[in-house]
Amino acid sequence: MIRQRTLKNTIRATGVGLHSGEKVYLTLKPAPVDTGIIFRRTDLDPMVEIRACAENVGETMLSTTLVKDGVRVATVEHLLSAMAGLGIDNCFVELSAAEVPIMDGSAGPFVFLLQSAGISEQEAAKRFIRIKREVTVEEGDKKATFLPFEGFKVSFGIDFDHPVFKGRAQTATVDFSSTSFVKEVSRARTFGFMRDIEKLRAMNLALGGSVDNAIVVDDYKILNEDGLRYDDEFVKHKVLDAIGDLYLLGNSLIGEFRGIKSGHDLNNKLLRKLRAEEDAWEVVTFDDEATAPISYMKPVLAAG
């Protein structure tokens, strides 16, 4: 059967918060079957636990932020994207601050950490959410949709009227039966416009942001010396963000997500709408890996 997964070992890392600019200590720990992904604010006494689920999303202005009883954990989407890509069901994420460290602005460092910790298959079937019919949310020219699909596919379209985006792909479709999340998506970095960053800093936000952890664009060009990691890195990062946001369903998806100019807010509204429409989805498990529409890297290979 396809089994639930957790980490073999505890692993630690240090980084800075994108918005706070503060140093953050991150610890990823194995968790029992059916735990889910649980964030822990270990800097608080008593420690506060916040489950990674759509209902706990409290803010979506610049990142996806989980909130419980006034306690926040911001910028969870890149770490959750890595968890989704590697099929990690159960994990404790301990943080010394109110924000997940930004690392290099992609999910790549989190993939490396998870693979370094090792992946352990557990004695319980992995539960998937299978989309049974279309569910859509729209706001103006933004749209987010779930569709039935035997596998997992993410399509995204962005539309920036800016010299850097001219002639670059602003759409991407990734079918994960034939495309590696680790190779093709996980390394895409977040991006920001210099003019926006200046405004954010005036509001005490993006204080940790730099060319070390984002693609920074001025009015004409990319400021990062090494350029882009993928030709379509901008839209690929939106795919990465969406995968992280969708993992707040609490299970891996069997279905297709299509986003047009969608962001964290609309993604979350789509999750809540899906949850409310119980005839639009079902929970499934697979006794036989060979017949399943989704497969994951073998835990041994995941360390490669």
Curated annotation (Swiss-Prot):
Question: Catalytic positions?
Answer: 264 (proton donor)
What does the record list as coiled-coil region(s)?
A: none
What's the domain of life for this entry? Answer: Bacteria
- Give the E.C. number(s): 3.5.1.108
Residue sites binding Zn(2+) per the record: 78, 237, 241
Q: Does the keyword Zinc apply?
A: yes
Cofactor names from the entry are: Zn(2+)
Keyword hit for Metal-binding: yes
Q: Name a single GO cellular component.
A: membrane
- Enzyme kind, highest EC tier: hydrolase
The metabolic or biological pathway listed in the UniProt record of this protein is: Glycolipid biosynthesis; lipid IV(A) biosynthesis; lipid IV(A) from (3R)-3-hydroxytetradecanoyl-[acyl-carrier-protein] and UDP-N-acetyl-alpha-D-glucosamine: step 2/6
The GO biological-process annotations, alphabetized, read as: lipid A biosynthetic process
* Record key words, sorted: Hydrolase, Lipid A biosynthesis, Lipid biosynthesis, Lipid metabolism, Metal-binding, Zinc
GO MF annotations for this entry? metal ion binding; UDP-3-O-acyl-N-acetylglucosamine deacetylase activity
Q: Which reaction does it catalyse?
A: a UDP-3-O-[(3R)-3-hydroxyacyl]-N-acetyl-alpha-D-glucosamine + H2O = a UDP-3-O-[(3R)-3-hydroxyacyl]-alpha-D-glucosamine + acetate
Protein family (similarity comment): Belongs to the LpxC family.
NCBIfam families, alphabetized: lpxC
Q: What does this protein do?
A: Catalyzes the hydrolysis of UDP-3-O-myristoyl-N-acetylglucosamine to form UDP-3-O-myristoylglucosamine and acetate, the committed step in lipid A biosynthesis.
List the protein's name: UDP-3-O-acyl-N-acetylglucosamine deacetylase
Biological classification of the source = Bacteria, Pseudomonadati, Pseudomonadota, Gammaproteobacteria, Pseudomonadales
